[in-house]
Amino acid sequence: MSFTDTKTVFGSLDSYVKGGIEVIDDDRRHYAFSNVFEVASLAKPYEKVVVGKNLRYVIETLRAEGTSDWFTASHDESVIVMDGSVEIDLVKLDDPERIAPAHIEGSIRLEAPPQGRRMGLMKLRRGHQALLPKGAAYRFRSTDGVGVLVLQTIHGPHSVEKWSEICLT
Amino acid sequence: MVGDLSDVRAMEQDFPSTRNESGYQRFRLGDFVFSRDEYFVHIEWRAQGKKLSHTMSADVFLRALMRDVAWNFFYGWVNFDDVFGTRNRYDRVELYAGRYHPVYKEQGLDHSACFDSSFVMQAFRSMLDDWTNVGYDPFAAPAETGLTWQGKKQGHNRAALNRARESCRRMPGLPGDVPLRTDRNRYPINRAFLDVPQDEPVIEAEPGFEHEVHAFNLFAYLSRSDVTWNPSVTSVCKHSLFCPTTEEYILPVKHANDRIEWFLQLSDQIEWRIEDRATGRPRASVVMRAGDVAAMPADIRHQGFSRRRSMLLVWENADPRLPQLYEDGILPPSLAGEFQEPGSVK
């Protein structure tokens, strides 16, 4: 048996086709339907726009453009590169509890360059997923124009919710 | 995890079975009787003193049964079709027929019964083992496994049924965690994803941090999945689980979650048929393309249709308190309440 479509279709900032909702007896808002490329196209660099929320857990979309601030968290986070190329610097914080104590969840922006040992560098392209280990400071650097990141984390002080702007209604 | 099938024979006396003229065993769980023939699975039960029966294609039934077993009854309801299914009550499993079908329910012809999860698991594994013929893989796309599900009983396919669900502790490829998929560990690139780049991230870890600085090619990992509609876990943030999967043809069940779950379409397109959880009444059709994100409310059942193999990220909140909080109405079934007036930012 053969199939005509042999090309895998991924999205990008330059090429995405948003789907939609055919309502039969429902309200589109129930589905909080958005598109990460569309959200990133309208966002500020590294603005942490919430596109998925399950109680305190969130998925955030980030527009990767230039170099981000340093962030850390008291728990593991992960990031998927949906478009572009990104480098991630990691630093093992000398005193992670001071910046992100265990009872504080979500990504915390560092007010000053991280103090600690350099852990390494990761160079990611589209489709790559990286661990952002708890207690480590990290920053993103887009190396090929503007990229799109999807962050698995917990709602924090820098999370931005604007459901009415980003979702089908 | 499906587990080893070597011990199922010892359990058969708990759900007595006999072989029919097609060579297949018949199973009884409480008042439910299950049998199959060359084409069909038949489910029988009693209600209001009457014997009721329901017939499904054996192909459809086995695909659904495979997911129910592999997912350990998953979250909430696994509807094999509009009539029969299971509800996970965590340590207990409810089997039902007609319970969530408005006509059976209205006529009082529905039936449900709860069993220990381990008992149902053993029974379902035994059923899968007996009813899956050699060459048939209920996890594979129809184009890959063909019509070997048909006909009289012929052998087994235990290798296919014994796959373990891949759930990482932190991320695949980390020391002590689930391995990455490669040709060497018998995960060739699927025929539909031959064009997916296989390059791995460049990792430059400082000495002493080799086990913490970690990334992998998620799309390549998915391109090597040998199953459809069977999420694995690739990252964990407390109860937040990223469960990507590859999908082709039709989700063999109508899943009704006992909590909100989310989908992020990573590639290609899936169409979701959305129905009311309790009645099956149509509510919406959701078309998701690469980059689309959507919530599946906690009061619906959904079934996906993927015309070519696609990559989907299923996002689950595995907090065990959630089913009761939704059941009690403490949590709303959707995020509609989060919407503010246009332009406002929370």
What are these regions (language model features)?
Chain A
Residues 1-60, 67-69, 166-169:
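A short, N-terminal "cap"/entry segment at the start of jelly-roll beta-barrel domains
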Residues 58-75, 92-96:
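Conserved short histidine dyad/triad with adjacent acidic residue
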Residues 62-66, 126-127, 133-135, 145:
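Tight coil/turn sites that cap or link beta-strands
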Residues 69-71, 76-81, 122, 130:
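His/acidic/aromatic-lined binding-pocket segments of jelly-roll/cupin-type domains
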Residues 88-90, 151:
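Short hydrophobic/aromatic-rich beta-strand segments that constitute the beta-sheet cores
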Residues 93-136:
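Short acidic-glycine-tyrosine-enriched beta hairpin
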Residues 144-163:
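A short hydrophobic beta-strand segment most commonly corresponding to one strand
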